[in-house]
Each structure stands twice: as structure tokens, then as C-alpha cells.
Amino acid sequence: MDASLPSDFWGRIVFILKNYGTSFGRGIGVTMAIALVSTFIGCVIGFFIGIILTIPENKQKKWSFKNIILKIIKFILNAYVEIFRGTPMMVQAMFIYYGLALLFNVHMGMWAAAFLIVSINTGAYMAETFRGGIISVDSGQTEGAKVIGMNHFQTMFYVIMPQALRNIMPQIGNNLIINIKDSCVLSVIGTVELFYATKGVAGAYYTYFEAFTITMVIYFILTFICSKILRFIENKMDGDTGYDLVTKDQLVLTSGTYKHKEKMNDLSLRKANKRGGY
């Protein structure tokens, strides 16, 4: 052990930060870049898959070519969602990174592999989130859009998604927080994110407890700050509490950005005022 390494716990913490602060900084940068970009790409993937999975089938022409193609596409997308939601990201990372190299001779760099793995994993979860958000909006909204001549995609973009997004936003934030923490599994393919950088720092002086104490605090700070920023955005999206969010799922009313208790209290007060003649 290096003679310059202090013997007390806090002294070692200071020593590690002074000598390896840049390593932690680079690890933080890589972790946040992977989490932010991959969450965004995953949301885009989930958005389009969610829309496709909610395309209604023509029951009168059950075996038409269009219906058969739609069934095949939905089957493939559902398989993708179930497989990537039902397997650990670490296993997916190993399978994709080494599988592409072995089967297709595709050798990806650190960034490409990290973005691909986390994005498709997030996309599987967000697909179900978007599908649930779409279903939560009252079906009368869809029927009304069809009456005025909108197709399914126009209905989703202009009518359903603006309403569903307020319900979906908390889950998007949750996935970002999860990706910040779970990016550490990418160390198995050599991605030098925060966890991987910490292993290098800890191994230099065998200060595993001290190094990972620092990393634990860093992860907490990152997720705490992100959660507060996301909560601020959610509150901004709440907007005016003088209108009702159109949903058919009462559970949605009690979750996420929708302030159910405040809304119910406001409605009760207005009804009481009406009865009182105000």
C-alpha cells in the first residue's frame, strides 16, 4: 500500500477525490450521456411501437392482406417488448455486443454499443408505457377524431398523445433514473462509465469501500437532481387545475402529474358554491 495513502476513512476519501477526481468526472459524463440520449431514443422507439400496437384491426375483413400484415408486425413488436422486458440488461449487453460481432462481423465502439443496448431496452419498457397512456384516454376521443376524417396516426399525434403525455411523463422520468443507475451493467462490455471508473480507482490502492462510498453518493446526487428537475417539469405540465383530464382509467387520476386530491377538493368546493347560490 502506498505510504502517502492516509490510514483513516475520511482521509482516504479526500485522497481519492484529490487524485482521481477527473476519473470520477469522466465517468459521470459518460453515464449521464448514455442515460439521457438512450432514454430519448427509447422514448421515440416506444412512441412509435405504442402507436402501432394500438392500431385497430378490421374485424369485418379479418383475413385481409392488410390485417394479416398488421398481425405479423404486432406479433414481432410484442415479442421484442416481452423479450427485452423479461431479460436482464446485462445479459442483453453481452448477447448484442458479442452476438453482432460473431454472427454479423459487426464490431461496435463503446458509444455505439452503449446507446444501442440501453435504447432498445428502454424502448421495450416505453412501448408498454405509451400503449397504456393511449388506452387510458377515453375511447370517445378516438371515435370523435375518426368522425371528422382523421386516420389512426393523425388521431394519435393531434388528439390522444397530447392528453396521454401528462400521464406518461412520470414513467419517462422513472426510466431516466433507472438508466442512470443501470448504465453500470455496461461495464461488462468495457464501457468506461462511473462504475467502471470506480473499479479502476478502487483497484489502484485496494480502497474499495471508500471508492464505492464516493460513487454511491454521486449516483444519489445525480438521481436526486434529475428527479427534482423532472418533478418541476411535471408540475409545469399540470397547467390550470380548472379542467378535467379525460381518462377512463381512474388509477391514472391518482398517479403521476395529475393532482387528484387537489382536483377533487376543487370540484367539491365549486359544487358547494353552486348549491349555496354563489
Protein language model features and the residues they cover:
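Transmembrane alpha-helices and adjacent helix-loop boundaries
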Residues: 1-278
